Amino acid sequence: QFPPYQGGGGMIEEVKKETITFAPSPNKFEAGTMQTAEVVAFKESLNFIEKLGVDKIYNHENQVLEYGLDKIKKNNSVTVIGNPKERGSIISFTIKGIHPHDIATILDEEGIAIRAGHHCCQIYHEILGTPATARASLGIYNTKEDMDALSAGIEKCKKVFKI
């Protein structure tokens, strides 16, 4: 009995000048083209995780994370944000005197992908007293060499901003 929340192909049974008849559920809620590629990719992702093993993935991410944190924390201009025991495989940080969006831009030029911004937690950033943070999210595909590149990228940021 709920009306559809969006329009698109496959969700309409009949259209007349004065009325529209929607397809029966669930089709009236599945407008547009089905995300076939995403469904296939999801299946393959699950196969990959199952083959590799969650413990192996967790241990690898932790090793890379600890290596990266050790390198980054040695830099006096960098503040690492967050509780070390609850961080997961994420490094959120700021560099004194450089806006996180500038950090992200410079790192991007070096081929390093991070995010910068509030990360959907503006209140936390208000509490921290920072307009935003830079965030490196690690996964099974990251290596210690990636952390070396991140550390070198941070040094480049400092050089560009003469810090």
Task: Explain the meaning of each model-derived region.
Residues 1-163:
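Pyridoxal 5′-phosphate
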